Every structure is written in structure tokens, then in C-alpha cells.
């Protein structure tokens, strides 16, 4: 998670599962991740926008649904899986929740680092996301080369950069609306990152 453009003062309450921002409702379902990014907000704060995202334990699917039902979900532009961790570390729960939200006619986005097929090498993760009804995926690229990516994002798996790019290509091929993002840092050649994204057919956004 990007440490820039974020309010870092948070309360000390138990970590929240949902939080509203920018007209969207964001879902924080895990603190587990597959990388240790040098720019991660977790190194500076326990949350964003005044919300504590440091979960004391992972909520069950039922707990997440119960929390969602407290909201007028149709009032939000998007329901976004994001949070302090990588949502695809809970792939089966993620798929179930996307399907539940889509049955209510809601627009669902996944913010991800694109490492899912390294976590589940015997599954076609993108196809499963498509089948669940996912509308949009936002993939953190954060670097124009594998070497820089490894230095900035410090992924746990080998070949994470190429796997992330392949995830983007598969999402586009599956007709999932796909956006590639980078954190604007001096080390990153944003223009080159944009070229890579556009060559693949993805939208591009600087966080």
C-alpha cells in the first residue's frame, strides 16, 4: 500500500473491515501480503484516512458479510478489495465475496499486486475472478524493470515482476477492466511504466 497521499493519523480501535473513501467502500480482509514494499504505509502507520486497518485477526466470510450489510451498499460507486494486505491470499473467500456482491448488482474492483498465480500455480486465477463477476482490477506495477521492482517491492516469490505483467495480460484478455498503477517516486520512470501499461492495453494511474 502506498504511503503517499494518505492521512496517517488513526485511532487505536480494533482494525476495521470496511471503510468509506472517495465515494467507494473499501474492504480490508487480510493483513497478509506477498511483498515488503519499501514505500508501504504499514511502515509508517496502522491505517489510512483515520481508520485502523491493523486487523487483530482475519475476519471470517460471515463477519465480512455482516459488516457489509451494515452499509447502504448501493450508495457507493465501487466496492473495492484492498486493505493492509494482498486480498488474493484469501482467494476462495475473495471469490465468494465478489459473487455475493455481484448478486446485489454492485460494481466490484480488486486492488492487487498481481502475484496470485504464484500463490496458486495450479489454478487459473484470472478466469476464476472473471467467473465470480469481477468488474475491474487495479494492479500495482511500481517499476519499469524487474531489477527495480525487486528492490522497491521486495517480493517473496521469484519472477514476481513477470508474473505480475502476465496477470495484467490475462485480465485484459479475459475482458476485465484493467488498470496498472505506480507510486510516483524518484527512482521510478513513470513514463516508461505508462508505455508498458499502454502496450499491454491497460489503463494507467500514478498513485
Write out the residue ranges for each language-model feature.
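Canonical Radical SAM [4Fe-4S] cluster-binding loop centered on the CxxxCxxC motif
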Residues: 14-60
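Short, charge-rich binding segments
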Residues: 18, 70-73, 99-104, 128-131
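Conserved strand-to-helix beginnings and helix N-cap segments that scaffold or border functional pockets
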Residues: 91-95, 122-123, 190-193
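Alpha-helical elements of the RecA-like P-loop NTPase motor core of helicases
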Residues: 38, 147, 191
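Core AdoMet radical
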Residues: 45-59, 75-90, 105-121, 125, ...
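Alpha-helix-loop-beta-strand connector modules within alpha/beta enzyme cores
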Residues: 94-107, 163-175
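Auxiliary Fe-S-binding modules of radical SAM enzymes
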Residues: 2-15, 32, 62-66, 72-74, ...
